[in-house]
């Protein structure tokens, strides 16, 4: 459905190739010097500029020294069911390297003079946390992606996560409440069959193959016409959680403090974040089950990130956006969108002054 917030007439900018086949679009004008960069990564199903509040951010950043970038990944649009976080963050690292070199060449000065911030929405937040918390470069080459080339990830001046929701708890919410006109009684048997099929197929994945699940079944649970591999299905649904969470299960509310220490708690050790991590949770996120206590969850993430006060990585302006939906795309989201934009502008302004 077309959002009333999409800008009519388009927005100006520059299309860049950061690899031969992947691009990033820079919202910018020629009238303002813009040495600083904010790279935005969307969630599952997103692509170039598909998150509607980007238009609000682009307008708000026009008079500042910041330019906003959006990008395509191999996993963009309907390819998320074949992707994985190592490949996503390798490509994000390539894009950031391109942006840093482009800005340094354009505006001069040292390579450290222009600030770089990475912002993720939804599953894009998983990319942000994966980028910051995993070994640098990544160390594992999966059998299903044998030509994956790991690259060294550059340190970031700042990082923002918006709507960091659990894909596992989102599907549990669907199983409890239904989806659209489908009841839980209709969805649950299909989901259980998919889980059984995926587990069986996962054994083949270890041998180097990645098996697609039937579209006729996955379309009852996930968006239609989207290829979904058994491997990614299990990573998103993480049936062994909370004891043994999958790669994609980073934000579930039932993960132990020990598990959070392996993700949020590793940001300090990896040393890839020079500044602060700001986390913005949507107060009325339709992907978050009613049983999740958002304030408690944010507090636990903060404690893990800051090692119970030993570090100061968590940004004080993190918090819940009142009445915000998941992507702030509904027609009643003007006030939450303004709240979000002001939070981001304040964060970026403080970063430059620091």
UniProtKB/Swiss-Prot annotation:
Q: Which Gene3D superfamilies match?
A: alpha/beta hydrolase
* Record-linked InterPro entries: AB_hydrolase_fold, SidJ
| Protein EC | 3.1.-.-
Judging by the UniProt lineage, the source's domain of life is Eukaryota
Coiled coil location: none
Protein keywords: Hydrolase
Query: Which Pfam families does this entry report, sorted A to Z?
Result: DUF1749 (PF08538)
> What happens when the protein's gene is inactivated?
Leads to decreased growth and increased intracellular accumulation of hydrolysis products of the siderophore fusarinine C.
The molecular function terms in GO held by this entry are: hydrolase activity
Please write the reaction equations for the catalytic activity of this protein.
fusarinine C + 3 H2O = 3 fusarinine + Fe(3+)
Quote the function comment for this protein.
Displays specific fusarinine C (FsC) esterase activity but does not hydrolyze triacetylfusarinine C (TAFC), which has the same core structure as fusarinine C. Both extra- and intracellular siderophores have been shown to be crucial for the virulence. Subsequent to chelation of iron and uptake, FsC and TAFC are hydrolyzed and the iron is transferred to the metabolism or to the intracellular siderophore ferricrocin (FC) for transport and storage of iron.
Record-stated family = Belongs to the sidJ hydrolase family.
Assembly mode? Homodimer.
The protein depicted here goes by the name: Fusarinine C esterase sidJ
Question: What is the native source organism of this protein?
Answer: Aspergillus fumigatus (strain ATCC MYA-4609 / CBS 101355 / FGSC A1100 / Af293) (Neosartorya fumigata)
């Amino acid at each position: 459905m077309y959002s009333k917030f999409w800008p009519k007439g388009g927005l100006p900018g520059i299309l860049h190739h950061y690899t031969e086949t992947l691009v990033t679009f820079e919202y910018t004008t020629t009238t303002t010097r813009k040495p600083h960069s904010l790279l935005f990564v969307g969630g599952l199903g997103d692509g170039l500029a598909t998150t509607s509040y980007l238009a609000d951010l682009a307008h708000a950043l026009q008079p500042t020294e910041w330019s906003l970038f959006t990008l395509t990944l191999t996993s963009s649009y309907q390819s998320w069911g074949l992707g994985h976080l190592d490949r996503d963050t390798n490509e994000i690292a390539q894009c950031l390297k391109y942006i840093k070199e482009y800005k340094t060449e354009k505006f001069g000065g040292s390579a450290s003079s222009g600030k770089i911030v990475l912002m993720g929405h939804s599953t894009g937040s998983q990319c942000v946390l994966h980028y910051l918390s995993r070994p640098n470069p990544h160390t594992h080459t999966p059998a299903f992606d044998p030509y994956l080339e790991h690259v060294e990830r550059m340190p970031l001046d700042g990082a923002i996560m918006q709507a960091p929701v659990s894909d596992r708890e989102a599907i549990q919410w669907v199983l409890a409440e239904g989806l659209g006109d489908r009841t839980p009684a209709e969805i649950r048997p299909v989901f259980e069959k998919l889980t059984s099929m995926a587990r069986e197929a996962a054994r083949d994945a270890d041998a180097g193959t990645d098996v697609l699940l039937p579209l006729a079944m996955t379309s009852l649970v996930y968006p239609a016409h989207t290829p979904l591999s058994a491997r990614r299905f299990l990573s998103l649904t993480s049936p062994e959680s909370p004891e043994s969470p999958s790669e994609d299960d980073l934000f579930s509310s039932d993960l132990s403090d020990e598990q959070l220490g392996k993700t949020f708690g590793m940001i300090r050790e990896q040393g890839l974040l020079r500044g602060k991590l700001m986390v913005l949770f949507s107060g009325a996120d339709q992907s978050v089950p009613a049983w999740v206590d958002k304030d408690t969850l944010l507090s636990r993430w903060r404690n893990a990130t800051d090692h119970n006060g030993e570090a100061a990585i968590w940004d004080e302006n993190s918090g819940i956006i009142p009445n915000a939906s998941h992507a702030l795309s509904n027609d009643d989201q003007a006030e939450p969108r303004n709240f979000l934009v002001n939070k981001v502008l304040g964060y970026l302004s403080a970063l430059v002054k620091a």
